[in-house]
């Protein structure tokens, strides 16, 4: 009996996640500000190196925003950009720890910028970029980009040294109800 309850719970979580993803893709596609525009607005407000950005949907798109992290003077500054108005709000600032500093140094050595990685990942898809981040993937410095198009989320990994797409995966987020 416990096994079937656990299976049902996992199915509920998956269905809820799919609905959330679909709502987020829809909200992002309807937002007036793109992730690329949000990056420019955030970098105008806080000068530094953008290390990640992601779309966050709240309250039926009224408060949808982009959460952006910018490194400046070995500190990580959180910035929020309203996805409909472009209003920039500064958030918390944290000192980078050793692991984050090592990752940041790897990003600084990258031959491909975050903006170039976004363009490369979205070159053929022409969807709405939902998320981008610099990361170490199996010891290699990469950019991970999520793009929403239709009822799918495309997860693309771009090598930060060559600009080549090393991995691409599609998730269907359409609800089955």
Where are these regions (language model features)?
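Long, terminal "pre-/pro-" and other extracytoplasmic accessory regions
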Residues: 1-177
